[in-house]
């Protein structure tokens, strides 16, 4: 994907695991080493609230292996037979991030996939709070320790940063 300037947006998974200690595929590094692709972005899921329970209990996390978090719980979504329902999972968070990436690339087509990944990671909102990781109330960590960027994707900030980068 990287050779063809494609950003791969990956759902982190829904086992409530620390991906820095459990091997899950696909990923973008070997044995927690350096990234082998700068166009692979892994996304964890957030609840629709701020505070200690903002990370969805089911969401995988990891300071090395998860890049960003985005809303992924209690998402109103389409379902088969022209219906709608509330869904949750990192597979709901990843499309939200892919949508922001598509918005950036549509407005700023000169940016590469690697630049868009950097924008998404750098422009997000940092939470200055401790959160429950993996749904285990005995596992409380600073939000910044659950993801490489320490941030939640923010479309507004991403577009501002992308406009500056595209100049």
Give the role of each language-model region.
Residues 4-6, 24-106, 110, 151-157:
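Extracellular S/T/G-rich loop segment that most often corresponds to the catalytic His/Ser-adjacent loop
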Residues 12-14, 46:
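A short beta-strand-to-loop transition that corresponds to the Sensor-1 phosphate-sensing loop
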Residues 21, 97-99, 146, 162:
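Short, function-defining helix-loop hinge/capping sites that tune catalysis or transport
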